[in-house]
Structures are given as structure tokens and as C-alpha cells.
Amino acid sequence: MRAVLRLLSTHTVFSPIETIVSVFVLATLAYFHILSGIKHSSFFASSHPPAIRPAFAHLTNGEWVAVSQHDWTEAWKHPGGSLDALELQQVVFTLDDKTQPSAVLDASAISQHLVSNVPALSGKAYSSLCHHPNVSGTSCFTSVSGPGASPILTLSFKPGTRDDWLGSLRKEKTITLDGVKYDVGAGKRQESIGDMESSKWVAYALSALVLRFWELTKADSLDILVVLTGYILMHVTFMRLFLASRALGSNFWLSAGIFSSATISFLFTLPMCRSMDIPLDPIALTEALPFLVCTVGFDKPLRLARAVMAHPNILKPQDDGRMKAAGDVILEALDRVGNMILRDYALEIAVLFVGVNSRVGGLKEFCAVAAALLAMDRLMTFTLYTAVLTIMVEVRRIKKVRDMTKARSRSSSITAVTANGTAIRGVLSRKSSKQSVTEPETTKNLRQRATDSAIGVKGSLLKDGGRLQEAEENPMARLKLLLIASFLTLHILNFCTTLTSATANARHQRHPFRTVQEVVPIPRVDITTPAIANILSHLAVAQEPMFTVVGSEPIELLVKVAAPVYVHALPLAPALRASNTNTGEAIENFMSSWSSLVGDPVVSKWIVALLAVSVALNGYLLKGIAAGSGLAAMRAVRSQGVRFRSRARSIVKISDEPEPEPEHSIDPAPVVFFASAAPAVEAPAPAPAPEPEPPVNRPPPLTIFSRPLNLETVDKKLQDALPIRSPPPVEPITPESREVEPTQVEVRSLAECVDVFENGPRPVSVALKTLNDEEVILLCQTGKIAPYALVKMLADFDRAVRVRRALISRASRTKTLENSLVPMKDYDYARVMGACCENVIGYMPLPLGIAGPLKIDGLMYPIPMATAEGTLVASTSRGCKALNAGGGVTTVLTADGMTRGPAIDFPSIVRAAEAKAFIESEDGYATIREAFESTSRFAKLQKIKCALAGRTLFVRFATRTGDAMGMNMISKATEKALDVLSHEFPEMVVLALSGNYCTDKKPAAISWIEGRGKSIVAEAVIPGKVVKSVLKTTVESLCNVNTKKNLIGSAMAGSVGGFNAHAANILTAVFLATGQDPAQNVESSNCMTLMEPTNGGEDLLMTISMPCIEVGTVGGGTILEPQGAVLDLLGVRGAHPTNPGQNAQQLARIIASAVMAGELSLISALAAGHLVRAHLAHNRSQLNTPMPSRPHTPGPEDVSHVQQLPTPSASDDKGVTAQGYVVEAK
């Protein structure tokens, strides 16, 4: 377990500040997560539902009077009398909160849309469901308020028809009209606690919390007593922590560090429990909090603190006079007590798991939270808490040095230097010494004595010198474990058996919990509000013609006013919301957001706490620097200022001349030496000539002088003592300079290099750093280092590439690679190694061009193309221009499924047929699908196609693979599926995981018919005038060339999937630019290009069908930064955050659209006869064809024109007659 502990704590103890800051940042994020969960939970929500009941009104004698629902129902159920019933429904439109305060909303358009275009669920229009205010009229009673912040649409309905129409409206959910998006039911509602401001939220939360706790007054007094006892024990635990920390010499910081570690563990535990679906109730957490504190306890962090304080080198130097690094002190303390701490954690978590499996309500959740909290507390103890202890050790050392420096200055004592220049260690390096100066004990006043008697003497457990006395193991941990086990046992028995008459079930039955819903009435719609009263008055005016006498009784009106429906209006274009926003308002909004963030009650406290800790810690560190580690450092501070030196420079000898003896003898005084965290490695280097032995009385490398030093002189001597290394040449390396290069760089013999390699510092990469490249090449050439293991041995990607390049070059016949123009520098080889390529010697750059942009499904996309073919990007751009003029390209995804087709052998065709039938059956397919999809959360099996060839069964799995191209994913899933199939057919033999039934990287009719990867169909309409002006041809000519070339010509050639002009050209260029597998252009380029006239022959209708585009945006070449940057340009890099597979599908749509642009441009060029001229102008190599060529047969008279090519093999291959020669054409 020590290895595990060191793995967790090594980084934290040597980088404590970074660890603490990182953990506090994560804790802040966890706090925001918890805060969001609390604000949007139902705990603080109102205990009654926010629904509002409808109101009922009766118009009699020109006045509206509230009536009951029974009266309105009677008028509805018994029509034909003097009463007429109807329903009113108001639709309130609200603007987005981010719009300007002065913005208004015109609801006339959306109101007309709702009335005219939204039918009821039954299919009836609103006009047939509405209420007519008079008998002869045909218009409905509808009212719309004028433009404003919240306009209101009022609709009238016949009785019983409002719900039919309202259900249809709510089914719409969203309506987009005139650039505005309307969300039905998402408008203004009762403000929830999640929407409140910080101050209002705190007040509301406190009031809701008080009300919730007030509801607990009906709880049993025994339960309240148990909770009260728990809180008392929790505060006793806090007091024990404070007293134990004070006994270890810390009044505040140790206990604060332990408490902060536990608090952060609790903050991390709550989101973790939420993700694990452990129910968390604030009331239950409040009741369980004291028991959680007692369960976690602080005995384990205190045990680790005692082990640190008991370390012999916490304040005492080592034998070489240097202080052991604080991180090493913490790690050695962990080695001593870490296993016991882990044992206690494991036992407590194991006991809590018994409670988790007890199936007792309440106890199960408490034990689950407590176990998770203990696990997180264990992690924080070995990470955050160890970093805090490291800082405490450093601060304690600095404080001790400062106190001793003050004592020396009071006694006017200085540091003594012995005859050989070694400073005498003081009281910190001795347990007891007669020469040590004993500080006089100060007389404590009454207040100090009272404090010591009440809370204990500070540092009472520490020896003289500040080190903890050895103590036996505290039995408190075992006692706590026993109490937890007893608590769980009694709780389970008290719940499951009737030991007494006052069990938990009996108390619950005698005191049932009453909710607020039983006493709080549900509110009604208020008909006296101005919005409703105004509508009712308008209805009364419109209804006056109906108040005629029929017989002798006037017709009266009863109205049901339902709760309003809110519709949220959100402008789609950001410019609409921010059209009036100037720079000053933007800055004001930013400052307001920042003020609200900083004004958060917890964030502001974190900032203040961190600032206070930073100021206090910086004060200690600056005082420690000022105090120094000895009198010489203190004098240097006074005279020359503070200078920081690394350990590597401190070992350089300052002078070869002996220093004069000090004039005065000095008393011994303590001196503390601080060492860096990692020791410097001194590698053996060859010396050009032996040097004479130095004198015996030579001072050691590190000497503390009794007189002030001139820092400028010391710096000059240090620079002179450093070895001088010549910089590498900046001019290009030529073959001549390469030949003399070994004489310029001294190369050690093979024996010396092998000695450094085998006996040098470990790991081996450190030893190889002391060898130059030529010496490493020598080791590789002699077989000591394998070329494929250079990266592992050197631990340097760039150097490994450089060395491998030299090895391959010198072993080749031409020996030109080492100094060739193949680039090597400024490349991130870390992403390549182990993922994309092996035996890397550089990289091959390709020109990257951008065609377009092209409008695809309403959005503009640039088309990245990596190619070395001239006119390709320009031609594709011309096609994009023509397609954009016609409105762009529309694409559809018809299928998405990567395939893998293994070959399986059976002993007979009968068993092979049975296996085929099993796979194609419902039960067999379900079994294989379950096994297949268990290997990845992205692998979703679409279908299985089987085929028999003798005794061999071929199974073609088609799978959705998310945003990855999916070959690795589906191969792993296929292996799992075949393993499950072998349980049903043990005699089967898997011949090959890929039996070429996929078919991968090979042309095949099955891929053309069934599809593989993404199947895309694209369509576009190009106007005839664009065909003439941009493409310089006609619609009739294009259709004729396409039919004769792409369809008839390909059919004559017997092509499979090759019914196109040059789809592979564009597809491969995009593949190379976006990091796809270029080998898969074989099947991905399967394409059928169709053209036909439309709109009476005036325009051109063009379609592209590509059934097997195999692309991905995750893995493979997409991990390389250049290719990833191109995917960023398209907005499809990585996995889609919400819809897996959407990024890869979008990339396939872009590729198909780009192919359409390239096809359109090339066929137009063929139809117009521009192809040859374009290639002669843009894609013809002038160096290789200096003159226009024409048919010519060389004869005997042409021998004089024979020239020899300057090939590297010309000097080696004698008598070559055909190779290396060319005949000029005349």
C-alpha cells in the first residue's frame, strides 16, 4: 500500500501551493454545482402546487358577479333557456429577459397565426369552436392588446371546446414566425427560487428552511433528543480537534487545515452522491450531519500530523548539514502510519456497507453517504492535507530559524567556522549539548496560566526542539469503529423487531406527518384584475345585441375564465436583441455579472479567506528569507540585498584559493541548511586533459563565511567556473561539413559510452542525456539500443526522431536522408507516437487550400482540401459559386453504420446453417446484440447480414459508432459477439475477424448496395443563367455529357460505384485535410452523379449519392493538431456534446456537398472544352517539359542528343543502357 500512498502524495507534497489552489478551485465548482442543485430542487419550493383554478362570473343587470362552478356547469349542460355559457382563455406573450428594457412586442402576427393556423386536436378550426357575441354575426369574440412588453390575446370558446384547442397549442411547443421563436408554456410563471437574485434567494431559503423545520415540531421528542445529542457530540468532536492541534503546537492552522479538508470532502461527496443516484434530502442531511462528523472524525489526520511532528528530521539537519526536504518528511511519515490509516478507513467503510445492504429506510441512505464521504476524505487526506502539512513544516522551520536569529542578535553571537571550513551545527542538530544555549523560561502571567489550565499547554506533546514524543497507538479509532457497528446493529434490530412498544414504526403510526397541502387552498383566477376586468367589459358590450327578449325572459351570460397560458418570445437573430446595445452598456452588463458573481455569499468568503491565508503565508516566507539560514545570509541581506541561487549553482566552487582565517573566535550557534526537493544529477563528462590534484586544505564547495561577500565577484567566478559549450552551427549542413563534423564534436569510445549507459544514473534516460547524439548513434549501431526503443530510452521525442533519422540515413545506400529537406522540427511527436505512425523520421507537409464557402443545409462552410494537384481547389470553388447561386446544397442522411464481416468455419454445412438461423432469429439477434453493445456506450448494432459459402459463414455487423470512424470499436464488439456465439456453437472456428465481407479498403458491390459508414444523398438546383454565366455551358449540354460519361461510360467499363467524374479527387483532399484514413477513399469515393433539366428545361437539377463515406471526428489522424484545427474550422472537432455521431455525420454531409461542387465544375469544363487549357495553364510542370512535345521516333541521327541524368546511382552502375538516360525530343 505504500506505493499507492506515494503515488497519491508525491506530487502534492512537492507542489503544495499548486495542489491547494487546484483543490480549492474544484471545491468552488462543486459548491456551484450543489448551489444549483439546491436552488432548482423541490425542497425550497412551495408545498402546494402552483396551479390556479378557473373563475366563474355571471353577467346580470350589466354587472359581473362571481358564481360557483356548479352554476356555470348547469348553464352548459342545460342550454336553450335564458342562460348562455362560454369559456375565456388568455394567452400572455412575454419577452426574453436579455432583450432591452425598452423593447416592445407586437403580438398581431402571432395572434393571427394562432387563430388561423392552429386547429384543435379534433381537427376543427378555431372559427368553429369560438363564441359568437350575437346570433346573426359570424365573427368570433377575440381581443388583442396593443404592442408592449407583455401583450395579451384573449380567445372565447363554446363550453367544452377550450381544452381541445388548448391541447393542440401545447402540443406545438415551439412556433417560429417572422424571425421570432415562441415557446408555449415557457413564459412568465411564479418565480422559482432558482430564478431569484442572491440576496432574495438567501432570504427565501432561510424562510423556507424555518418553515420546513417548523413542520418537524410534530416529531417525537425522542427523535429530537437523539438529533440534539448528535449535535452536542459534533461540537465535542470539534473541541477535541482544537485541543489536539494545540497540543501539537498549533492554535489555528492545523485544526483549520483538517477542518478544511473534511469540508471540501463533504463538498465533493454531495455531487458524487447525486451522480450515483443516492437520494439526498436537506432535512435528512441536517439530521445526519452530526453523525457524519462523528463517523468521519479527525483521528486519522491527527495521527498523520503526530507522525510528521515525530519525524527526527523535521527541525534537525541531516548528517551532511542539510535539512531534509519537507516533502520527504511527509512521505516518510506516510510510510510509518499510512497503512494503519488506510486500514481504519477500509474497516469503517466495510461496516457502513453493512448498513447500505440492510434495506432499512433512512439508514441505507445515511450509510451510503457516510461511506462515500469516508472514501473522499481518504483521498483528501493523502492529497490536500499532505500539501497543507508540507507548508506547515516549512513555515515551522522558517519560524524556528527566525526565533534563533533573534536570539543570536540579542546575545551578539555569530556563526563559528571550524578549521576545515565546516559550520558547526547548533541546537537543532543535537538532542542535548552542554554548549547549547538554553533560553530562559519566561514567567507566564495570570491570563496565560488560566488559558493553559483551561485548554491545555500549547505544544505539550512536543519535546525540546519541537519534535513530538513517541506515543502508542490511540485506541479511539477502534472505539469509534465499535460504536459505528453497535449503532448499525441496534438500529436494524429496533426497526426489524418489536423490542419495545416505542419502535420507529409505532412512533410513526402514532404521529403521522401532516403536509401543508391539507390546509392551504388552491387560488383562483382573480377576475378583478385590470386585464380580465377589461376583457369582461368588452364582452358585455359586444353581447348587448343578444340581450333581446325571447318571450319574456332576457338572455344572461355565464363565463368561465381559465388560467392564462404563457408564451415566451425569443428573437432568433442575436442582432435583434443587441441592436441597441453600445459599448458602454456591454461593459456595464459585464461589470454587473462580475459583481453578482463576487457578491455570492460563499465565493466572497472564499476570496477573503484565501487572501488572508496568502498574506499570512507570504509574511512568514518573507521574514524567513530576511532571517536567512545563517549569519552570512543575514549580512548579505543587509548589505547587498537578497539573491536566489539554485542548488546546481551552489555546488560550484567559488574559489580555489583558501580564505583567510577569521579574526575573532566565535561561539557555536545553530545553523539550518535547506535542500531542494529533488537532488541534482551530476553526469560524468570526459575531460580533455588530466588536471593536477588540488591542495589538501581546499575549502569545500559550500562554505559559510564570517565576512560579507561581494555578490558581483561571486557571480563572475561562478560564470568562469561553468563549462563552456559551443552553440550548434546555424548554417545549413552540407555533405562536406558533415564529413568533418566528427572532428568538431568529441565522441567518447564505445567502452565509455557503454559504461555510462549501463552504470550511469537511473532512469536510463538521465544517463543518455549526458551523451551527445553521435554517442547515442554509436550505441544504436552496436546493438545496445534498439532503434524502435529510442523514444522510451531517451524520453525525448524530438531527439529520438533526430537520432533515428541519422541511423536510417547512414545505413541506406544514398545516405541523403540525414541532411535532406524532409522537415523534422516544430512538430508535436507526442501525439504521433503509439497512435499514428512508427519509426518516425519527420513529417510530410501538404499544401492546404480552401474552396468555397459552400452553403450546406442553410449554413456556409469552407471546404478544406490538402492536395498537390493544381486547379482542383479552384475548380471546386467555381462549383461552390454556382451551387450557392441556386440556394446551396440540401443533404439527407439515409444510413449510418460501420461494418465488420468475420469469417467463421463450421464442421458441416448443417451447423453453419443452424448458426445462420440462430443469428437471424429474434432471440439470437437479441443475445448477440446485448453482447455486442456491452463493449461501448456508443456502439449501437443496426443490423446483421449473413451469407454462407460452403462450411464458412460470413456475418456482416452494421453498427453506429458515434463520432468515431469506428473500426476499432466495432472490431472489439465483434470479438465479444463471436465469443457469445461460441457458447451456442462450441465447434465453430473464427478464421478471421475480417473476412473481407465488410468490405474494408476494397471496392465491393455490397458496400455500394448496402452502404458502409455514412450514406449521404445531396441535391441542388442551379439556375440556367448561372450555368451560362459561371459554368460557361448549357443545361442540355451538361445533362448530355453526364449521361454519356458518368452513366454509359462507367457501365461500359463495368464499374461498381464509379458513376462519377472525379469524386475521389475531392474526397481524398478533404480526407487528408481533416485527418481521415486516406486508404478508405477506395469505397468512400463510390458516387453516382445524376443531372436532369427542371423547371421546363431552364434550370439544372443535380443529385449526388454516396452510400459509404467512412469518416470520424474522434481518434485516428484527428488527434493531430493541424488536422484538429481544420475540424475546428468546420465546427465538428471531437465528439458532439449532446447527440453522439452528429459531428461525423455533418462532416460526411460537407464532403458529399464538396464532391457535388467538384463534379459540377469538371463536367462543365468537359462540356465547354476548358479542361485541357486549364491544366496546361495551372497544373503542368514546366521543369519537366521545357518544350511542347510532339510524336517523334528517335533514330540513329539522334544519338548525339542523348544526355545522362545526374542520378545518385550513375557512378555505381556501370554499363547501364536503359536506366539513367533520356533522349531529347525535337
From Swiss-Prot:
Where it mainly occurs, coarsely classed, is: endoplasmic reticulum
Q: Which PROSITE patterns match?
A: HMG_COA_REDUCTASE_1, HMG_COA_REDUCTASE_2, HMG_COA_REDUCTASE_3, HMG_COA_REDUCTASE_4, SSD
Q: Which CDD domains match?
A: HMG-CoA_reductase_classI
| Compartments where located | Endoplasmic reticulum membrane
Q: Where is the composition biased (Pro residues)?
A: 685-702
**UniProt superkingdom:** Eukaryota
| Coiled coil stretches, renumbered | none
Catalytic residues, chain numbering: 869 (charge relay system), 1001 (charge relay system), 1077 (charge relay system), 1175 (proton donor)
EC class (word): oxidoreductase
Question: Where does it sit, as one GO cellular component term?
Answer: endoplasmic reticulum membrane
Enumerate the residues binding NADP(+): 936-938, 963-971, 1179-1180
Q: What induces it?
A: Expression is induced in ganoderic acid (GA) producing conditions.
- Entry annotated with the keyword NADP: yes
Single Gene Ontology BP annotation: ergosterol biosynthetic process
Sequence ranges assigned to domain SSD in this UniProt record: 223-391
Q: Which keywords annotate this record?
A: Endoplasmic reticulum, Lipid biosynthesis, Lipid metabolism, Membrane, NADP, Oxidoreductase, Steroid biosynthesis, Steroid metabolism, Sterol biosynthesis, Sterol metabolism, Transmembrane, Transmembrane helix
The family line of this record is: Belongs to the HMG-CoA reductase family.
Q: What is this protein called?
A: 3-hydroxy-3-methylglutaryl-coenzyme A reductase
